[in-house]
Amino acid sequence: MGQKINPIGLRLGVNRTWDSRWYADSGEYGRLLHEDLKIRLYVLEELKQAAVSKIVIERPHKKCRVTIYSARPGLIIGKKGADIEKLRRKLSEMTNAETSLNIVEIHKPEIDATIIAQSIAQQLERRVAFRRAMKRAVQSALRLGAEGIRINCSGRLGGAEIARMEWYREGRVPLHTLRSDVDYGTAEAKTAYGICGVKVWVFKGEILEYDPMASERRAAEVDHSGSSSNRRRENA
């Protein structure tokens, strides 16, 4: 099942959380959900070149807080903050509520699955060989600390008559292990031969903070190290 399902959705409530964080009555839920979709589509369309990874939407009472995670925050902010203020006003009109806009910089875009997928899609649109684009992304991710990465490219790759899927993997990507920190991203490349899809999985290690066994082991290690240091003092 882990091979088929979206790995982020599989880990919700385990080591991942939702990108829309709000509660609403049954009558308002549908409207706010569609509003979130419109906000995301608009922001992604406006900030195509800003390497946007994800958009988190929170809704305090009669307000809206939008957080954009980007590898190029300078492109969003603009000269003296002019661009970000223009974007904030537009989002306020869309939500009909007081909207605040936060920008969070991604310091390692080479291991962010969504940004990797967007980069490969842009290279495919520029007619870069898909194998070269995939291999370059894999090498960069492993060099920056990823423990494993898998990339799928599908469509009429290289202008072939018959569509196919090619994939490349380095390291390990444990999709069934819930405590594994697996990032997942997709993108589309609109080429002259049609649309090519790109999927990226990045394994960044295991998250053990939520594992009760891991916390017990850490506590035991602390007790063991403390008793060892006490014995050394007594012997001295």
Curated annotation (Swiss-Prot):
It comes from the Bacteria. HAMAP family: Ribosomal_uS3_B. One of its GO terms (biological process) is translation. This is Small ribosomal subunit protein uS3. Pfam families: KH_2, Ribosomal_S3_C. Belongs to the universal ribosomal protein uS3 family. Keywords: Ribonucleoprotein, Ribosomal protein, RNA-binding, rRNA-binding. It comes from Bartonella henselae (strain ATCC 49882 / DSM 28221 / CCUG 30454 / Houston 1). GO terms for cellular component: cytosolic small ribosomal subunit. NCBIfam families: rpsC_bact. Residues 39-107 form the KH type-2 domain. Part of the 30S ribosomal subunit. Forms a tight complex with proteins S10 and S14. GO terms for molecular function: mRNA binding; rRNA binding; structural constituent of ribosome.
